[in-house]
Amino acid sequence: YLYNKGLLYDSISAPDLTGDYDNMTDAEFDKIVDSLPLTLTLYNGAPLAPTVEEADLIPNARDVFVIRHPRYTRPNLHRHTYFEINFVANGQGKFIFEQEEHILKEGELCIIAPNSKHDFLIEDDSTVFTICIRKSTFDTTFFSLMTRKDLLSYFFRTILQGDNHANYLMFFTNNNSVIKKYIRNMMIESSKKDMYSNACCISYVNLMFSALLRSYSQTIQFYNYEMGADFSL
């Protein structure tokens, strides 16, 4: 399909990533994402592994990697070894977690712990950005976050100390423009190849976490595996 459409190349030139992404409409930024090159790995027909490893998705020498979540995918409950953050920028998506279904709507953000069996489905032209963060380097990359006394820090500390229970945190941001700007800039930095892009992504993640706690700490919804249910602060 890509070859017939003239979209498959042996080599690609670096895209121009110098625009003013903060003030674009969702449709304008979606076109920018459409123009970003993708590196494809040929599928050999073997069954998909039930657990996605960090190295399967996050490029070498990166601690943070951002993609626009694929649309119209087949259901595939899976686990992975990294933290996944899904932000619904436009529309909605179906979040399946431990046999439960949730519809995430525009402005909602969900942090999924490693080793949690889940799936995320987009069945229309909605836009969801997925932030992948290495678990293996999290405690050093986000050291300042680990020393704070809030539920977000507790969530990460508990997991990094060896708790492998399925878990998630959810924020309801009312589609805050500041959060969206941070994630857009993370997405663009993930597409850059210079020596500064990883550090920039880390900085935007820290800004995003701080903004979430500053404005939306009272909206946190936490999957409590001991209770088997959600509760809100």
Tell me the role of every PLM-derived stretch.
Residues 8, 19, 41-57, 61-63, ...:
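A hydrophobic/aromatic-rich effector-binding and dimerization subdomain
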Residues 59-157, 193, 198:
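N-terminal regulatory/effector-sensing and dimerization cores
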